[in-house]
Amino acid sequence: MSADPRLILPLDLSSVSEARAMVETLGDAVSFYKIGLELLATDGMALARQLKGEGKQIFLDWKLHDIGATVERSARVLAGAGCDLLTVHAEPQVMAAAVKAKGGSDLKILAVTVLTSLTDADLIELGYAFSARDLVARRIRQAIEAGVDGVVSSPQEAALAREIAGPDFLVVTPGVRPFWSAKNDQARAATPADALKAGASHLVCGRPITAANDPREAALKVVGEMAGL
């Protein structure tokens, strides 16, 4: 069994050397990697370029959130690096700037709707007048209007995203936990099969793989759960 390109493995590790070791351990079981804020300050871009040179796909989960001009300049640099996916916060000005910056590159812009660790109660505490589902729907529509390529949404909102956005929109779902693993801090988790059936185009699955005694075997088990869906 080989890698499924719909499975994205987050390299949420403390150093580039640890991340590099994990990639070597996983071998051909994973072909798509997410590089987040943990590695941003420790040569994460160098790792991204290295992995791209080895034929891997790269998702920069940096959740850009600043004034439009700053987001545009930053996204333009990242588009030139040849990465595949980049996250920005789902605010109209931010999304429009990132879309403008990517130009004719292959970079796909993903809007972050609502973090999967947040519950409806959390959103009320933060001052939002919407449930997670309603806020996700609102931001998906704004993302479509801004011209982004997809959204990051929890498995529970994947069907909503697919219904609103149609078949060609990317729906990347973190908070994916195989049936044999714990939910950890993902308040709105689902199995790989559940997320794909709901409409997800890509799944982000981390600790069930990286914290396993045999990460490669765990990755292949997840790929097996995705097979045929």
From Swiss-Prot:
Keyword Nucleus: yes or no? Answer: no
Pathway as given in its UniProt record: Pyrimidine metabolism; UMP biosynthesis via de novo pathway; UMP from orotate: step 2/2
Molecular function in Gene Ontology: orotidine-5'-phosphate decarboxylase activity
* One GO cellular component term: cytosol
What EC number(s) does its UniProt record assign? Answer: 4.1.1.23
**PROSITE patterns listed in its UniProt record:** OMPDECASE
Q: Name the InterPro entries for this protein.
A: Aldolase_TIM (IPR013785), OMPdecase (IPR014732), OMPdecase_AS (IPR018089), OMPdecase_bac (IPR047596), OMPdeCOase_dom (IPR001754), RibuloseP-bd_barrel (IPR011060)
Q: Which reaction does it catalyse?
A: orotidine 5'-phosphate + H(+) = UMP + CO2
Q: Which domain of life is it from?
A: Bacteria
CDD domains this protein is in?
OMP_decarboxylase_like
Which PANTHER family does the UniProt record give? OROTIDINE 5'-PHOSPHATE DECARBOXYLASE
State what this protein does: Catalyzes the decarboxylation of orotidine 5'-monophosphate (OMP) to uridine 5'-monophosphate (UMP).
Q: Which family is this protein grouped under?
A: Belongs to the OMP decarboxylase family. Type 1 subfamily.
**Designated name of the protein:** Orotidine 5'-phosphate decarboxylase
Query: Gene that codes for this?
Result: pyrF
